[in-house]
Structure formats: structure tokens, C-alpha cells
């Protein structure tokens, strides 16, 4: 009986995450999440489940669906929460992408240590995702589809997002709902063909299934094979990153520039996916980066403005700034070179003696300005130090100085006033 595939999938989940784990269930009230929540309640205590309904406010029935979800959770004895999110500024990404982004932001913010996020994506969803990504020319990351388990990096913690029904076919989910006489809500927007996924679901995939009855399963197999290939590429990227220098905002190519472009591209992809928040690479960015790497002019300082932030390239180093802070004024104990995204993560405490510790009260850290150095020899020496230290030009213009009572007493990494 096909409905048992759902129960087997939930049994696999419980084996993977034994008690006392908590489950955060993305619960829309639709067929898929209703089946997942019901099956989960048959295997674990309802007290270990927290169901969350994300209200985008895009449909007139949104509040009614929230009420239906609340009543369903009350019947099951499950904690319920309805979260309102605002979907706006859709000119660039489209309403589907923005709604999905807002939904996951809300869900991820509620995942804590010891809690697993569950979403009800199934085999048909995987087939749709694979074909949608193929249609937009995605690389191997997109063609590998949705993973069964995805690690989430949030607030220096690694949390997990699991899709327990990912290998379950849609017929089995319908069969489960029929077997246990479940009720669910129907979103009328799922029939609107203006949405790309709906067009694929209602117009394209039925024709493919008619010719190839097991196409959903085969698409899922292809995604799985590509996921294995992606894992190998990630391992290669980790090896390459060991030979270079990087943080969450820059990647140096100095020691790896002799590698072929495809390998550098793979390393850059992995770096952004693993360490950089808010940056999504595309063909245009890759082309720009390749041109930067091939540029033989050491004085070149290419820059690329993005919808969010900007990319810069200097001295074989790629930088990503989401908000480059040019103006700042910080108390001494608030200063953090990494937070300011300075290439040299230096610290004033490294150049100040213990005797100077008592003199720090009332000091502030601010950017360097042209009048901080009075003599030409000092300016020349600082310029030489910047060059030898390979400090990018934009960092030179905002380089930190320590000031007390209107006087510069130290320049980060370069100078400390003798009388201080």
C-alpha cells in the first residue's frame, strides 16, 4: 500500500534524529505538510513538535488558512505559531522568489540548537526544482536539486533543515491523506499558470509523465547523482582553500592563480556558498572575475556594483562588501578590524604596551584623514608601509587611527606616539 511510504519515510527521520530532538514543522495547511505533520505525530510526542504557519498575506484567504492550521494543531496537541511576513520589492526577483526568501528567513530564525526544521517537499517537488533550474541554465549546485538534509549556518551555529518526504512520490502522499481521512486547505494560486512552477506542474510535467511514467523518480535519481558529484567538487574546493587566504569578505588567489579557470571558479563558488552571506554568483560575475584574474595591470582596481553590495578586485584578491563603512567613530573597546572589513585584521592592543592601558580612557578610533600626518616624510613612510603591506586603496582612505583629546596617538599597525 503506497501510503505506507510516508510512514516509512517518517520512521527513517526518527531513526536519524532520535529523542530528545525537537521538530519545527513548516505547516501551510496544504496536503503535503498536513500529511507530514499527521505522520510525525504518530511517531513522536506532540510536545516535541512546533508547527509554524508563514502568512505572506498574498491571498485573501491567508488568515482563514492560519485559523485552519491552528485548529488542526489543537486537535493534534501540537504547539502552533502564525508568523506574518511582508512581501515587497519584487521587481528584480519575482514574487515567488521573494516569498520563498521571506518564508525561509522566518523559519530559520526560529530554529534553535537541538531543533530540526522539517519541510514537506516530496519527489514531484524535486522533479520540478530540477527542471526549473535547468531551464534557467543553473550549474551543478542548482541541478543537484534539494538535499535531504541541509546544514544552516546561523549565528555561529550549524543547524539542520530536513525534507523527510523528499523520496516519497505524490501518489503515496495522496493515498496517506485518503487512508486517514485528512482535511487540508487548497491554495487557489497553485492553479495560476503565470507562476513558472505551476506552469511546469500543470502543463509540462503531465505530458512528460504520459511518455515516461517514472519520470519523477528518474529526475530525483539524476538530482541525487549530481548531488554526489557536487560533494566531490566541494571536497576539491576545500583542498584548494587550504592553500589560500580567505575570510567572510575576501578570497585571495595569490597562491592558486596557476590553477585552471574551472577549478578557480569552483573554489569561488564554494567560498561564497560556505562563508559569504548575501552573495549569489552568476555568469556575469564569473565573467568579470575571469577578466580580473587575466588582467596583467597591477594597478587595476576593478569594481562591480551588485543589487546588494559590491565586488572589488585588487592584487589577486576578491572582495565582497555588503556595506563598506567609510565613516565611523568607535570607542577603543568597540573597535574590530574584521567587523569593518579591513584586509589586515590588526589590533591596536598588539602595538600598545601594557603601560599605555591606563591611558586609553577617552580614546576613539576613527578613519585616517590627510591632516593627521604633518610632515612629508611621515606621509611618505605611511604610503610606503601601505604599499609593502598590500593594503587596498579603499582601506587606506579609511585606515583606523587612535585619537585622544583631538590628537592622533596611534595609526593602526604603523605608528604609536612616543609620548603616549
From Swiss-Prot:
Q: Which InterPro entries match?
A: Lysidine-tRNA-synth_C (IPR012796), Rossmann-like_a/b/a_fold (IPR014729), TilS/TtcA_N (IPR011063), tRNA_Ile_lys_synt (IPR012094), tRNA_Ile_lys_synt_N (IPR012795)
Binding-site list for ATP: 28-33
Where located?
Cytoplasm
Indicate the enzyme's highest-level EC class.
ligase
Pfam families in UniProt: ATP_bind_3, TilS_C
Entry GO CC: cytoplasm
Q: Under which EC number(s) is this enzyme classified?
A: 6.3.4.19
Source domain of life is Bacteria
Q: Which GO terms describe its molecular function?
A: ATP binding; tRNA(Ile)-lysidine synthase activity
One GO BP annotation is:
tRNA modification
Kindly state which reaction or reactions the protein catalyses. cytidine(34) in tRNA(Ile2) + L-lysine + ATP = lysidine(34) in tRNA(Ile2) + AMP + diphosphate + H(+)
Keyword tags: ATP-binding, Cytoplasm, Ligase, Nucleotide-binding, tRNA processing
What PANTHER family has UniProt attached to this entry? TRNA(ILE)-LYSIDINE SYNTHASE-RELATED
Q: Domain notes, please?
A: The N-terminal region contains the highly conserved SGGXDS motif, predicted to be a P-loop motif involved in ATP binding.
Q: What does this protein do?
A: Ligates lysine onto the cytidine present at position 34 of the AUA codon-specific tRNA(Ile) that contains the anticodon CAU, in an ATP-dependent manner. Cytidine is converted to lysidine, thus changing the amino acid specificity of the tRNA from methionine to isoleucine.
Q: Which family does it belong to?
A: Belongs to the tRNA(Ile)-lysidine synthase family.
Protein name, as recorded: tRNA(Ile)-lysidine synthase
Source organism per entry reads Hydrogenovibrio crunogenus (strain DSM 25203 / XCL-2) (Thiomicrospira crunogena)
